[in-house]
Swiss-Prot record:
This is Pro-adrenomedullin. It comes from Rattus norvegicus (Rat). The lineage of its organism: Eukaryota, Metazoa, Chordata, Craniata, Vertebrata. Disulfide bonds join 107-112. It comes from the Eukaryota. The record marks 113, 122 as: Required for CALCRL receptor interaction. The gene is Adm.
Amino acid sequence: MKLVSIALMLLGSLAVLGADTARLDTSSQFRKKWNKWALSRGKRELQASSSYPTGLVDEKTVPTQTLGLQDKQSTSSTPQASTQSTAHIRVKRYRQSMNQGSRSTGCRFGTCTMQKLAHQIYQFTDKDKDGMAPRNKISPQGYGRRRRRSLPEVLRARTVESSQEQTHSAPASPAHQDISRVSRL
């Protein structure tokens, strides 16, 4: 029994130590790759800045240089010429992206993302809402105040006359008279 528990402890510690050392190896490999990339990037920028002392590229020289690089690539079969030309093109792209400045505006926090999402939902749900009623409801056969306003004068006169005849023909209680006054308004 003691032998099994000791073996389990050894296997557990071996697994933990093995996992820790594996993490260190990947991070050190990443650091090596990162440093190598940064050094090559610095060398390319240094070469580009020495070729353009002012740091600005003249617009007239750019097309001729790119044409010259393409001609060199097509005529020479050496791999060294192609890597130099691609490195030179990369530097130009990098320089152009630096001149453009930051492309995205706003923040990238989770709360900002939620606010943008809520705003988009509001726009999508509120876009179709109008302050006006549909066309078929605005017609004289429609509903509400629009219907009463759009009735022709002849029909209004008839409704007023018919309501007056009803009040004159039969005496109504004071409550009915108040209701009829309110409905006339």
